């Protein structure tokens, strides 16, 4: 009994909770990094054309772009015995596990189900790729919100996001390293099968272990029946009445979609500038990262992905893919180092200098990749992009925290030009029941709108509440509505949408550009050009109060 009590106290310690949460961060990044490395060559090998291959890679980001703001709002208002975040994390994790099963076994499943397996194999492979990309990237939004829920103190917030960035980099290192190993000749091959089956079997084992760690996270519990918002007389429904709750949820879901569109489109100018800068920076970096292994395999090693197994051309391509995986591994290793020293860099040089330096370093690295035919130079350039990767993982989110800590300065309330109708004529309903703004959560946190003032944050992080009350306003003219107080979870979802959107344009257009140019070097040229555009928009970001007057925000 004493031993159990000691273990329970140990697991509920702040550092233990931080490690348990970020184990899932590690697992997600391992799966995504291995997928980014291995999926494009796999699609090319089964006969998907270059332009269609890039479009397949855009399926997950497009779906995520639509669902991330909605999921962020739904998570803020969810109530259940397992908390607000973990049910969404577990549901998305199931999708990832399904994709890890489908991708290496698409041909085997297609052969079992139909006599002509080729079309079904392609369909199952595309389904698996889209599911992995969508669930893996969307899962980061409730995970970031869970960190913000549990680590609200400025010092703890800074530590939480530093560990978060560190675990992303560490997961990327392992995820890029695993495809670089020739598993066909390893000791695991007789037990796990081919290269693909060995790789994805290991990914499944790693991810299951990381998801199991979230069972020990001490998230807030349910508070009981939700109180209706002020001024509302919501009908009371028994908790066991599932059809009633389902009808209510679907009714509010239909009304919430246009409201979310309004919230995202009418975001404050400070956040809009940060969004555009992050979008351009991520677009450049993801164009580089998504197609780097294909560029090395075809461009540097002169391999052919559709060549027969055992031929010289195919062997060169496979060697190039493994060398490309090594370059991306070094990218994550450099990112890991910078995530450890990022706080010191910001304290020494300031957020503006570090952010601009990281964005400016990228086109230099991408340009060197375009111009050089040396494997060593290209690999070193890929490693240099880890600085940009680390900065984009940390600084935009901590700037968003700064905006919310001083929301009266950086996030002014917006009101329409015309006068509104009386409150009696409007009906407001919550999407899902949740605690009132300012009401304490069971773990002692205070919701958005609480009266407590937080102390000044350290260099990287400002604490803020992570719950946002997104209410659907029915029966009131659009111009009379007041944009509700924004919570950080919605704005984190918007920043995550920039990351997802940054993969859509490259996925849609890069394949056609490469086919027109007849050279995979077009991948790197496009990345360098987007990096130059990102430098301009990075100079327009609001880093402190002096920028508000400078940019007339």
UniProtKB/Swiss-Prot annotation:
Reaction it catalyzes: sucrose(out) + H(+)(out) = sucrose(in) + H(+)(in)
Gene3D superfamilies: MFS general substrate transporter like domains
Keyword Repeat carried by entry: no
InterPro entries: MFS (IPR011701), MFS_trans_sf (IPR036259)
Highest taxon in the source lineage: Eukaryota
Record keywords, A-Z: Membrane, Symport, Transmembrane, Transmembrane helix, Transport
A GO MF label: sucrose:proton symporter activity
Role noted for this protein: Proton-associated sucrose transporter. May be able to transport also glucose and fructose.
PANTHER family: SOLUTE CARRIER FAMILY 45 MEMBER 3, SUGAR TRANSPORTER
Family of the protein in this entry: Belongs to the glycoside-pentoside-hexuronide (GPH) cation symporter transporter (TC 2.A.2) family.
Name of the protein: Solute carrier family 45 member 3
Source species: Macaca fascicularis
Organism placement in taxonomy: Eukaryota, Metazoa, Chordata, Craniata, Vertebrata
Gene: SLC45A3
């Amino acid at each position: 009994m004493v031993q159990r009590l000691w273990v329970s106290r140990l697991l509920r310690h702040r550092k233990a909770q931080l490690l348990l949460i970020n184990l899932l961060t590690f697992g997600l990044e391992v799966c995504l990094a291995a997928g980014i490395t291995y999926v494009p060559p796999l699609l090319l090998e089964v006969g998907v054309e270059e332009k269609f291959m890039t479009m397949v890679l855009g399926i997950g980001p497009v779906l995520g772009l639509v669902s991330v703001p909605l999921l962020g709002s739904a998570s803020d208002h969810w109530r259940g015995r397992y908390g607000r975040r973990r049910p969404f994390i577990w549901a998305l994790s199931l999708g990832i596990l399904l994709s890890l099963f489908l991708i290496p076994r698409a041909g085997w499943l297609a052969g079992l189900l139909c006599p002509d397996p080729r079309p079904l194999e392609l369909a199952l492979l595309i389904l698996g790729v889209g599911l992995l990309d969508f669930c893996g990237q969307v899962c980061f939004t409730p995970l970031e919100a869970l960190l913000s829920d549990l680590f609200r103190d400025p010092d703890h917030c800074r530590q939480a996001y530093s560990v978060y960035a560190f675990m992303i980099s560490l997961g990327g290192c392992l995820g890029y390293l695993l495809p670089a190993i020739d598993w066909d000749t390893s000791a695991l091959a007789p037990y796990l099968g081919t290269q693909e089956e060995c790789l994805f079997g290991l990914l499944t084992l790693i991810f299951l272990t990381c998801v199991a760690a979230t069972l020990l996270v001490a998230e807030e519990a349910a508070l009981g029946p939700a109180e209706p918002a002020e001024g509302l007389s919501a009908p009371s429904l028994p908790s066991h009445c599932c059809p009633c709750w389902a009808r209510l949820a679907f009714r509010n879901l239909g009304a919430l979609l246009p409201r979310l569109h309004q919230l995202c489109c009418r975001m404050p100018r400070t956040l809009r500038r940060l969004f555009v800068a992050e979008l351009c920076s991520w677009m450049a970096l993801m164009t580089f990262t998504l197609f780097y292994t294909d560029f090395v395999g075809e461009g540097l090693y002169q391999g052919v992905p559709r060549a027969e197994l055992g031929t010289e051309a195919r062997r060169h391509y496979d060697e190039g893919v493994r060398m490309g995986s090594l370059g991306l591994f070094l990218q994550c290793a450099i990112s890991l180092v910078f995530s450890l020293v990022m706080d010191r860099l910001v304290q020494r040089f300031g957020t503006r200098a570090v952010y601009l330096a990281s964005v400016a370093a990228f086109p230099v690295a991408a340009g060197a990749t375009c111009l050089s035919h040396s494997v060593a130079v290209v690999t070193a350039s890929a490693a240099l992009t880890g600085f940009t990767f680390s900065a984009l993982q940390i600084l935009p989110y901590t700037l968003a925290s700064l905006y919310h800590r001083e929301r009266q300065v950086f996030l002014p309330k917006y009101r329409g030009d015309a006068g509104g109708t009386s409150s009696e004529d409007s009906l407001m309903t919550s999407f899902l029941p949740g605690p009132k703004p300012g009401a304490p959560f069971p773990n002692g946190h205070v919701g958005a709108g609480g009266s407590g003032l937080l102390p000044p944050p350290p260099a990287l992080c400002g604490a803020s509440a992570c719950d946002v009350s997104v209410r659907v306003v029915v029966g009131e003219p659009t111009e009379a509505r007041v944009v509700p107080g924004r919570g950080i979870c919605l704005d984190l979802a918007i920043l995550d949408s920039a990351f997802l959107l940054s993969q859509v344009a490259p996925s849609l257009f890069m394949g056609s550009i490469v086919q027109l140019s007849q050279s995979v070097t077009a991948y790197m040229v496009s990345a360098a050009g987007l990096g130059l555009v990102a430098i301009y928009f990075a100079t327009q970001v609001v880093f402190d109060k002096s920028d508000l007057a400078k940019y007339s925000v």
